[in-house]
């Protein structure tokens, strides 16, 4: 018998005084952790299957369950942590690349938490958002350097297509296939209700969701899955995905187990086949090639839709953004290294890319220095966790923010980081009909509306406290920010002063 070096990560603690053996946990767990033992007349658990999704804990009618981290410990070693040792065991057992989902969980600096916001006191009165108007409306797209009027006072400057947002927040790209039909419906309906946008991701747009096109951003990625004329015409904007924060430099991969039924038809690939996106776009090897695709998409959409270029936050991101701003693109979306994903190689997710805070500040400053900041809007994502992160991002230079993981949390995600298995017990990252139906889009979209509405209220309160009454006045206003515990170089890149200055 071979020795199994892979110990369970979690322990299922069942209170026998509370457990009534109703078997709800058994029915609800897609990982088959729980079972009823007829001989023992009790519930038992196979803890090696547990991913800590908390479905059983939430559904238990008597609160008899809790999931705890196992106390299996190796001899303490600052270099070789228990997690690192287990990863070596896993690869020695399988011979495969380690896969993970969601964003980078490593204890690297979170710069949002080291930046503090200003508030008005005495000499500069604050504004009460309950009694005075606050403008959170945002327009994304190219802006003219000056406005010209004719002799009658009418504007004669050509204004390029713009995206109008009621609040500077959008739902980031999550493809149909990586997440469920019901999750997509929740996002689309919430975007329509809020007056913002959701992004289809690289899996095409289900025919049922074309009616939400006015609040939809359609994506064109290297695999070109589901891309056709009607698809490009359906959305309010077109996004070219050049990179993703969770896995810069590589393409996407959706396993064949998720390519079923409508997912297959929407992506226009055979059922059961793996959807593998190439690392590069095979028609883009330069800024000139990118410009050609930008204008091809503009031509295909009769120049009525803004074109977004999405890139990962990498070391030379400012120079890359400078080139994109000259390519004819209307919006640049930058995805930080903590950005979520349905599946990515663990080593790439945890070691490639840079924090979105530094990337945003560097890009905004570079475009300003070159006098081309008005040529593009900047949208940032990659772990925007709260309204405070949104305010700080806008003060650093962003026009709007993408949220993905926060939106999934609102739908019930518990960050068990097992999206790649397709067994999501919350009906989000799965295509199994019995699991998908657990996410009710009538409830899901309302929870998303509640989340963004709550953030909007908080944004207004923070802006009012600063004595600012519009997003326009906050954008790039780095004087409203101060750093804590940052070194001189970090402060220089962020373009902010240290607290106390």
Locate the predicted segments by residue.
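Conserved, well-structured core domains of diverse proteins
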Residues: 1-6, 10, 33, 42, ...
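Conserved active-site-proximal phosphate/metal-binding subdomains
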Residues: 3-6, 75-81, 85-118, 342-357, ...
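Glycine-rich phosphate/ribose-binding loops and adjacent secondary-structure elements
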Residues: 8-10, 21, 26-27, 31, ...
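Structural beta-strand/beta-sheet cores of well-ordered domains, especially the beta-sheet scaffolds
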Residues: 10, 167-172, 194-196, 214-216, ...
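Catalytic cores of large soluble enzymes that bind and process phosphate-bearing ligands
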Residues: 17, 21, 48, 52, ...
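Short, well-ordered alpha-helical microsegments
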Residues: 53, 226, 317-320
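Active-site cores of enzymes that catalyze phosphoryl transfer or operate on phosphate-rich substrates
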Residues: 238-287, 292, 299, 315
């Amino acid at each position: 018998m071979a020795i199994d070096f892979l110990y369970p990560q979690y322990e299922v603690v069942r209170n026998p005084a509370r457990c009534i053996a109703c078997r709800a946990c058994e029915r609800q767990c897609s990982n088959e952790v729980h079972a009823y033992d007829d001989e023992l007349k009790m519930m038992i658990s196979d803890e090696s299957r547990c991913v800590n999704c908390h479905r059983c804990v939430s559904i238990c009618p008597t609160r008899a369950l809790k999931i705890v981290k196992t106390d299996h410990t190796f001899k303490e070693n600052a270099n070789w942590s228990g997690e690192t040792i287990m990863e070596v065991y896993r690869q020695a057992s399988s011979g495969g690349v380690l896969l993970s989902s969601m964003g980078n969980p490593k204890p690297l600096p979170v710069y949002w938490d080291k930046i503090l916001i200003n508030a008005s006191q005495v000499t500069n009165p604050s504004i009460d958002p309950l009694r005075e108007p606050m403008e959170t409306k945002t327009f994304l797209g190219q802006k003219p350097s000056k406005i010209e009027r004719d002799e009658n006072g009418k504007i004669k400057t050509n204004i390029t297509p713009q995206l109008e947002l009621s609040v500077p927040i959008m739902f980031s790209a999550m493809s149909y296939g990586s997440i469920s039909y019901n999750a997509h419906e929740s996002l689309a309906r919430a975007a329509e209700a809020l007056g913002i946008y959701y992004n289809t991701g690289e899996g095409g747009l289900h025919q049922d969701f074309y009616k939400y096109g006015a609040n939809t951003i359609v994506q064109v990625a290297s695999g070109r899955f589901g891309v056709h004329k009607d698809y490009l015409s359906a959305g309010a904007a077109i996004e070219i995905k050049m990179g993703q924060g969770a896995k810069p430099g590589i393409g996407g991969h959706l396993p064949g187990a998720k390519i079923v039924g409508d997912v297959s038809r929407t992506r226009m690939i055979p059922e059961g086949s793996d959807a593998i996106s190439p690392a590069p776009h095979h028609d883009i090897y330069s800024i000139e090639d990118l410009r050609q695709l930008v204008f091809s998409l503009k031509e295909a959409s009769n120049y009525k839709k803004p074109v977004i270029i999405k890139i990962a936050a990498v070391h030379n991101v400012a120079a890359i953004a400078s080139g994109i701003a000259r390519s004819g693109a209307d919006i640049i979306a930058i995805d930080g290294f903590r950005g979520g994903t349905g599946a990515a190689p663990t080593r790439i997710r945890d070691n490639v890319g840079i924090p979105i805070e530094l990337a945003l500040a560097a890009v905004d400053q570079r475009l300003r220095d070159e006098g081309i900041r008005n040529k593009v809007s900047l949208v940032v994502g990659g772990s925007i966790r709260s309204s405070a992160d949104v305010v700080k991002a806008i003060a650093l230079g962003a026009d709007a923010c993408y949220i993905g993981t926060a939106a999934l949390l609102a739908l019930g995600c518990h960050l068990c980081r097992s999206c790649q298995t397709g067994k999501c017990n919350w009906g989000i990252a799965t295509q199994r009909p019995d699991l998908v139906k657990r996410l009710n889009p009538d409830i899901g979209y309302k929870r998303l509306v509640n989340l963004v509405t709550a953030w909007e209220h908080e944004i207004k309160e923070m802006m009012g406290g600063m004595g600012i009454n519009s997003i326009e006045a906050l954008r790039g206003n780095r004087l409203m920010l101060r750093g804590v515990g940052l070194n001189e170089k970090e402060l220089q890149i962020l373009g902010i002063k240290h607290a106390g200055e």
